[in-house]
């Protein structure tokens, strides 16, 4: 039988991997906008549909780590959770097609930082999951 700690690591790993792929997709879409392969309205329509699922899944990851008493990983995820909460409170999480070219550099930078964060967390969670499953045996 799998322990709750192993379940937390597996669930967080899957959600974190999905968020990482989502951010890579966003970076590709922003690059397409720079190269004029996609228009701003289509970009905003596609990416705005993906913003809340990312925020919700990252919130779920953070809550699972808190419930699983994985304090160090919880604290590592807390700054991004605060960043997401700040975006939602100030309503800057939604992309505006009329403003996207002026804010493109900031959005690309934020997405590269998120990709890096999710990549580091992915391998950290993978290591923790493997160690947790080995210790159960």
UniProtKB/Swiss-Prot annotation:
Keyword Transmembrane: yes
Primary residence: endoplasmic reticulum
Short name of any one Pfam family annotated for the protein: Cornichon
Disulfide bonds: none
Single biological process term from Gene Ontology: intracellular protein transport
Membrane topology: Multi-pass membrane protein
Keywords for the protein's UniProt record, in alphabetical order: Endoplasmic reticulum, Golgi apparatus, Membrane, Transmembrane, Transmembrane helix
Protein family (similarity comment): Belongs to the cornichon family.
Name this polypeptide is given: ER-derived vesicles protein erv14
Organism: Schizosaccharomyces pombe (strain 972 / ATCC 24843)
